[in-house]
Structures are given as C-alpha cells and as structure tokens.
Amino acid sequence: MPPRLRPTHLEYVVDGVKLRSQLSAAALEHAGDELAQRRAALEILKNALFRGRMIAKERLENGAGGIETARLLSGVTDEVVSALYDFTTVHVFRARNPTEGERLALMAVGGYGRGTLAPFSDIDLLFVRPYKQTAHAESVIEYMLYALWDLGFKVGHASRTIDECLKLSREDFTIRTSILEARRLTGDEKLAGELVERFRKEVVKGTGAEFVAAKLKERDERHARAGASRYMVEPNVKEGKGGLRDLNTLFWIAQYLHPGESLEKVMHLEIFDRREVRTFIQALDFLWAVRCHLHFATGRPEERLSFDLQPEIARRMGYGDRGDAPAVERFMRRYFLFAKDVGSLTRVFAAKLEADRVKTAPKGISRFIPGRAQKRKPLDEPGFHEVGGRLGVDPEIFEADPVNLLKLFRIADQRNLDLHPDAFTAASRASGLITSAVRRDRHAAKVFLDILARGRDPQRTLALMNEAGVLGRFVPEFGRIVAQMQFNMYHSYTVDEHTLRAVGVIADIAAGRLAEDHPLAVQTMPLIADREALFLAMLLHDTGKGGAGGQELAGARAARQACERLGLERSKIELVAWLVEHHLVMSDYAQKRDVSDPRTVADFARIVQSPERLRLLLVLTVADIRAVGPGVWNGWKGQLMRELYTATEAVFRGGRGSDAAAALKRYQENAAYDARVSLAKADPLAEPWADAMEDAYFTAFSEAEVLAHARLAQQAGGGAAAEGRIRSELNAAEVVVAAADRPRLFVDLAEAITAAGANVMGARVFTSRAGQALDVFYVQDASGQPFGSHDPRALARLAETLACAARGEPVAREPRKPQDLGRTAAFAITPAVMLDNEASETSTVVEASGRDRPGLLAALARTISDAGLSILSAHIDGYGERAVDAFYVVDADGRKLTDARKRNALKSALLAALTKAEAETAQARRTNLQRARASVAR
C-alpha cells in the first residue's frame, strides 16, 4: 500500500485570491465584449478545476486518504463555484444599489453540502432569495448555471425563498435531508444563516421520530433496489448495502437529533465505543477512496465496482499478489470486511433507533441509546428476557459464561425473535470472549449444533452470528472465508454468504419448500440418517478455498479440525470430511461425463460407496449449486443429476459385491426392454428402429419422448428431419435431429446452431446400429432464455436449418451482434485441455476449458473432426466466463485415441483454438484497465 501523504492546504491547490484576480483581469481586458469575457472566464475556471482534480488524483494515487480527497475535491469546487458567483455578480450583472429583494445566498446542499465530493459527482446548489424572484437574481442564476454546465458539471439546482424551503422540507424528506446539510458557499451571509436557524426551529424540532422512520424506510428500499445482500460480488459503493449511503444515513440521523455537529463530534456522542468509532472512520475513508478511484479510472460518475474495474482499482490502491491470493481478491476481501463492519455499525445505531419508537420530541441522541425503561418479560433462561417483542440480554452474562453468546442466538431462533439492538451490540462487543477453551466446550458445541442442524431458520440465525462476529470466532475455519470473494463471474456472493445461503437451501429442502424445483432432493431428505453431518459439511464445504493442496483437500483438513474440536465421534468426523472433499464430484460426473456410459456410473459409485453417501451428496450438491447465484441452477442440471443418481442407486441395489458396470448394464437392459415393449404396442412400425438403438438411450428419455423420436426417425428415412419444442422446465428449447450418420455431422449441426444465433447448453448424441444418428440439442438465446420462447417461428426455422445441415446443404448465417465483452474482458483465462482414456471403456474423453463465447462448441468440434475423430457425445458446462466442454471421441476405426503423437497434436490444436480466442479478447478490449487471472475455484 502507498504511504499516507500529509494533508495539503487548499490554497496550495487553488488560490482563491489569485483566481479572482485572474477573472477580474480577464473582465477588464475584454470589457464591452460579453462573449469574450465569458470565454476567458471559463478558460480560467476550467484550468483551475482541472489542476485541482489532477492534484487530488495524484495525491490519491500516492496514498492520500479517501475522505481527504473528497474534501479536497469539494474545496476545489467551492473555489470555482464561488469565484464564478463573484465574477457574475461583480462583472456581468452587478447590482450597483441592490435592493432588499435582490439579496441572494448561494448554498451547497446534499452530499456537496457535507463538504465531500467524488471527482464526477453531481453538485446540488440552492439559491436562496428573500422574496419572489427578481430579474437580477434570475439573470445571475441563469448565467451561472450555463457556465457550470459548460465547465462539465452536472448541476442539481433550485431557487427558493426561505419559506418555500421550509414548506417543501416539511413535505419531502429528500428535500429535508438536503437542507439538513446545507452549507453557505457565498452570497448573503444573513440570508443563509436565517435559513439554517429557521430550519432547525421550525422543521427539525420535535420531528426526530418521523425523520428516523423515514430514513430507515428509505434505507430498506434502497437496499432492495441495489441488491439485498452486502456481499454481492459487484457492489455499488455508493448505494449498496454496506456502502457510503449507509454511513451517511447514520450521520443524517445523528445530525438531525443533534444539530450543528461535525462528523467527528457526532461519532463521539456515546453511540459507539472507541473501536467502533475507529472502524466508522476507517470504513468511510476506504469507501471514499474506492469511489474516487472509480470516478478517476472511468472518467464518469461510476458507482458500481464491477468485475472489469476491480483489478484496476486494486492496482491503484496498492494491492499486489501475495502467495496464492491475487491482488484483486485481497482488495475485494478488504472491501467486504468494511461492508460487514458498516452492517454492524448500522445495526448498532439504526436498529436501536427503529426499536425505540417515541412520540415526543427527542432532546438529543441520548433518547436513543441504552438505558430507557421498557417492560421486560423474563425468560426461563437466566439473564435473557423479551423486551418490545425482541430478545434482550443482561450483558454481564457473557463475561460470566461466554457460552451464553451462542445461547443468545439459539433462543432467538427457537422463539422466532429478532435481537434487541442492545443485545446485538453486547454480543458483537463480547465476541472476543470466545477463546480456544470455549470452542472446545461440549455444551457450546451442542448449542451451536442445535442452531445449525436443528434450528428453525439456520440461515438467518447464522447470518446474525456472522454479522456479530460470533460465528467466525467460534468456527475459525469459517472465519477465514468471511468476506472472501473469487474473481470470476460464476459466483454472485462472497464465500461466507454463499455458504450460509446453501445452508438455508438445505433447510428449505428439509421443510419441503422446494419440492417443485428439487423433487428428488426433497424426496431423498427424509431418508438421510445423519442430517447433522450434512449441515456441518455444508457449513465447511468451502473452507479450503485458498488453502494448500487444493480446495477439496484443504477443505477436508479444515473440516476434520473443526469437527474434532466440536467433540464429534470419529465416524461422523470422517463422513463430514469426505463430503467436503467430494462436494464437487457429483456435479462433475453429471455435467462433464456421459451418464449413460457404464464406466461413468461405475467410477462414481466406487467413489460414493454407499446409498447414504449418495443421498447426502445429492442434497449437498443441489444446495451448493443453487446458492451460487440467480439462474445458476436450471432444469437441465437437475435432469442430469437425477439420471446419475438413479443409475448409481441401481448399482447399489445390485448389492455390495456386484460389479458396478455390470449392475448398470442390467439396469439399462431392463429399462430398454420395457421401453421397446411399450413402443411396439404404440407403434409397431417403430420396432426395428428401437431394436437398433443402444440400451443406454432408453434410460435418458421418457416413453413419450422415445415414441416421438421413433416417428421423427421414420419421417427422416434415409435423409434428415428435425423438430423443436420449448422445454420450460429445463429453461431451454429442445431440438431433435434424426439423420443418416456421417463424418462431421455433429460439427455441421453445431455450426448451424451458432449460425442461427443460438447457444448450446446441452447435447445428447446417439447412433443406432442401423447407421442413423439421433442428436438432441438443448439451446438458449443470447439472453439465456429458451430459444424461440418469444418467437415460435424462430424455433421452427432452427429445426429446418438443422435438417438442411444434416443433409449437407449450405446454411445461411443469421446476423449476430458483435459480442459485447463488457465485464468478461477483465478476466484473463488460461485455456486447458485434458485427454483421458480411463474415463470410458470405449472412448477417449477430451475435456477443453476456456473463455465462453458464441460458437465455442462448434469451433472445438470442428478441431476434433479435423483430427480425423468422430464425436460420440458432447457435454457442455459453464462457470461464468469459463466454459468446460467434454467430448467422447473415437478414431476412424472406432477405437480410443492411443497414439501419443496424435494425442499431442489434438491437444495442441485445441489449445491453439482456445488461446486464439483469448488473445482476440485481450486485443478487442476497449480500455487499458488492468486485467486479472480468473479464479477457477468453484
């Protein structure tokens, strides 16, 4: 981090006296030529503003604080605006003998009135006049506004009398808040002072309670608009939860209840202890630094810390890579830790005010701090009570027995009570009492496990514990991932937030609330014997991120350590550790491998070993994926997961001593026999086609789908036919192609889909013994919706296009907008290719990973085909900006690719295709902002 610079004096940056002298000289030089006067004045002011901003930028980049920078920018703007006012009223519209009605005061209001300003923020100005508008005042205001606009300012402005200001502020809390921070810049001092004095007496006095309620409601609505979680990985620094506006809200309320005090004085009104005051100032300074850097980096009032800006801001703020921790992730963790601190401060302060509803006028901030009498209802647990419908506590019981810190949250959960603000504050301040001895206390472990595995709402309760700092103190392994982010587009939340949401998903599955989305998981949950192990594994599943030896092994070590400290029996410890180590296995096998291949299921079954572990892994995997972020879980993933679960369950039903592959083959044979019998009854003409299809095909589709496929194959005959339909439960359109098999068929179909502007999210490829191919594609449009869902004709055209492509006819390419790289360009993605001859008995599995883009599947398939290989199946998976495509391939003789030279050539060709796309992305990026390596952690 750059060393902090000593504060500078404003006159060293913008000399107000010199600035006014220059303006006066320009006015005299161009006397009689108003346009020349104006041009000269604007040039002088523009230079002063530019110099001030550049000095502020340079100082910020060399270690100046965020608050100091914001105050310096505000000071520079003050000098420019007030100098313009003086120039306007002295040299342009001078009132030689001003009347009482021509008095005018210029005041900064809103955030600018607070004396802090980001580089490209709006400025809010209030022109205060004593009576109705005069021609002189109107001319001054109009001249100034046009000049400010020409200087590049975005100006919010109003011209009002004092009475108008007071009337409007009574009616509108936004205006009231704006005037609360009003600050005179220049003009009539008496007029400005009268507004401030009357505002406090006639508006503020006696209205503290309603102002508090309005600000808290406004805060909640703002959070809902910006994203309810403060741990969204692209936070809004100004408006987001845990951002600057939350700190401003605290200051507004305190200032309203204690008028006229500075920020520093407000912080010492016995609201916070010394540590919290220090945290408040540090958070405010950090957030202001981030915001100013954002503005300077983009040249616009950018408030969102988006992926494409995060590496650049990390660099500007002096963060570097440290070990396995990239600079961008270190910076963002710092951001989220401060956001968490802001949340705690907000809860200590704002929730206290919300709880203490008063009808009489507050006489100061003391009306809202602890000590006011409220009726208490003692609980059967000593030291705990219910007060105002919330759970209260006698703070001394934490010192007497720190286990009471955990009991506080268990009681709140059991009784469905929110914490009284005093109780939350006391718990947060006492979290340091949780020592190694408390972590090993058996009673403490029981209380904690009651919350986690048997609680009414474990996600909410654990989130409160996390906010208070109690959870990370009691489970240090979890504490290490608090506020940790992964620099990729796959995850929408920080690691701790994702984890707590995943715990909540398991609780919802257990309660049956997700039966529609996850029927198999809901049906499976009652069969799980050890729910405690499941919840523990979910809480600890990502604790290995950033650890030595890889995420899975490091996580298993952390899980063992945590479970041993909790005093669990050895078998449960090993089960939790196994689940953590293997929590990605089921999704990998379901999404990247051919579930109809007996080797896939056999290998997976060997890893899982038992039906209980299979059930645990299913629920764990579903919850993990669903909690990653909106839209990550979809019906297609659910279908693949169900197929793998069902096939593996069939293996276990075959008995412990049975061969897994043989058991699966028996399962497929039985399913195929039943399907063929049903199909023969429904359509006798389809019997030859069904007999020629491989057994594995029948486990992938329902009887109705098999019948539809058979009729499509009959329609195709020796040529080709295709049909499409919307599969809303899969969030995709399904297009089925029946055609005579030939080399490059899959490549031609994939390229035709790309040409039509569709994206492939899944594909199934089957070839009958009679030489007819049946390829099923699941496709979406560019917005991630089922292709053709808004235009059924588009889906019909796609089906016809694929039929043409299958017949070898040329395909017209639909015009497609150039890909907007946007945020994805910030990620430097290292391509990877892996060839595996052990994953299948009959095929070589080729797995290629690189930047996701339209046409990637077709490009990879073309490269494989050019190598003389046939694609038997394709499996498409994606993790944000990264795609992972797996292909089952054979050579011209129908065998695995065993020749080392050919394997290396294929790998090189695929890497070249992936690397070319990555290089093109880097070149196409529109800015020179810093990039960072994308995290591959899941």
From Swiss-Prot:
Keywords: Hydrolase, Magnesium, Multifunctional enzyme, Nucleotidyltransferase, Repeat, Transferase. Transmembrane segments: none annotated. The keyword Nucleotidyltransferase applies. Residues 495-617 form the HD domain. InterPro entries: ACT-like_dom_sf (IPR045865), ACT_dom (IPR002912), HD/PDEase_dom (IPR003607), HD_domain (IPR006674), NT_sf (IPR043519), PII_UdlTrfase/GS_AdlTrfase (IPR013546), UTase/UR (IPR010043). Disulfide bonds: none annotated. GO terms for biological process: regulation of nitrogen utilization. It catalyses: [protein-PII]-L-tyrosine + UTP = [protein-PII]-uridylyl-L-tyrosine + diphosphate; [protein-PII]-uridylyl-L-tyrosine + H2O = [protein-PII]-L-tyrosine + UMP + H(+). Belongs to the GlnD family. Modifies, by uridylylation and deuridylylation, the PII regulatory proteins (GlnB and homologs), in response to the nitrogen status of the cell that GlnD senses through the glutamine level. Under low glutamine levels, catalyzes the conversion of the PII proteins and UTP to PII-UMP and PPi, while under higher glutamine levels, GlnD hydrolyzes PII-UMP to PII and UMP (deuridylylation). Thus, controls uridylylation state and activity of the PII proteins, and plays an important role in the regulation of nitrogen assimilation and metabolism. Has four distinct domains: an N-terminal nucleotidyltransferase (NT) domain responsible for UTase activity, a central HD domain that encodes UR activity, and two C-terminal ACT domains that seem to have a role in glutamine sensing. This is Bifunctional uridylyltransferase/uridylyl-removing enzyme. The lineage of its organism: Bacteria, Pseudomonadati, Pseudomonadota, Alphaproteobacteria, Caulobacterales.
